[in-house]
């Protein structure tokens, strides 16, 4: 199958994918409505027992560490806050609509654990560099940045397995180039297409599309820069490299755009190590 035919097949397959659960789309609309309140949001969540149970599970997880058990859904929503409940609804909805079939050697658990780690890193960087109001859409972006891999795993497992086999012998940064050569597009573009179909904001879908591309400083945005940096920090192996002090040219551009240096990156590496248990706890709560 030539690349043009394969690309068209990808577009048609994405059109066949299910939409987000109706509860999630209803909640997203409520979160955008300034007239919404905790009672309205809780009422919608109650109609989806699975979502309600997972929100309670997160509220009682080690990730938050509340001193008393929380059994009332409305109280859980109040304690977690609208932004976190929105992130949870999206997280759970995406995993429900697009479960990894593990047709290739890619591990669905490993993929989503990495995505949760990047999400938590991006939110923390957003809080440190900007402000709390910016942080939740960064969490969602981090969570969904590799969703295109699940599309490949579901519908193009044979081609994607070839990618994975070849990528084992190259630098991780070359993965998207191998995808482009063997599949026709990379997982960022596939993910961006899916998120556009699901009506996610363009700042999220466009950032997902280009997060592995080599970009000039004129093409960088805050979201893409934080995503690139969060992805690298998540993968960085402190067992082999004790500190981050020699960024390549592209990451140098990202650090310059964000107006941070090696010290900030090493602080975020320390943060990543400090929240490992919380990352696992959060993943287990929503999975």
What are these regions (language model features)?
Residues 1-9, 252-287:
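Terminal helices and disordered tails flanking the catalytic cores of nucleotide-processing hydrolases
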Residues 1-146, 150-162, 168-171, 175-248, ...:
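Conserved alpha-helical "signature site"
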């Amino acid at each position: 199958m030539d690349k043009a035919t394969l690309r068209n097949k990808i577009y048609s397959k994405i059109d066949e994918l299910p939409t987000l659960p109706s509860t999630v789309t209803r909640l997203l609309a409520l979160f955008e409505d300034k007239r919404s309140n905790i009672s309205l949001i809780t009422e919608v969540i109650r109609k989806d027992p699975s979502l309600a149970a997972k929100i309670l599970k997160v509220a009682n997880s080690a990730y938050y560490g509340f001193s008393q058990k929380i059994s009332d859904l409305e109280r859980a929503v109040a304690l977690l806050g609208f932004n976190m409940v929105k992130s949870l609804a999206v997280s759970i909805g995406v995993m429900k609509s697009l479960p990894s079939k593990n047709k290739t050697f890619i591990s669905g658990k490993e993929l989503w654990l990495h995505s949760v780690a990047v999400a938590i890193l991006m939110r923390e960087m957003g809080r440190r560099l900007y402000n709390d109001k910016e942080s939740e859409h960064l969490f969602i972006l981090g969570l969904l940045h590799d969703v295109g891999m699940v599309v490949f795993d579901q519908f193009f497992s044979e081609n994607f397995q070839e990618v994975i086999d070849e990528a084992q012998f190259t630098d991780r940064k070359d993965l998207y180039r191998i995808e482009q050569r063997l599949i026709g597009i990379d997982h960022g573009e596939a993910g961006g297409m899916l998120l556009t179909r699901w009506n996610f904001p363009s700042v999220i879908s466009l950032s997902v599309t280009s997060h592995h591309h080599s970009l000039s400083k004129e093409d960088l945005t805050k979201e893409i820069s934080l995503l690139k940096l969060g992805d690298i920090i998540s993968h960085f192996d402190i067992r082999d490299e004790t500190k981050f002090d020699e960024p390549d040219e592209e990451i140098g551009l990202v650090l310059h755009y964000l107006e941070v240096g090696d010290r900030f990156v090493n602080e975020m590496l320390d943060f990543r190590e400090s929240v490992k248990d919380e990352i696992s706890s959060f993943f287990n709560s929503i999975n």
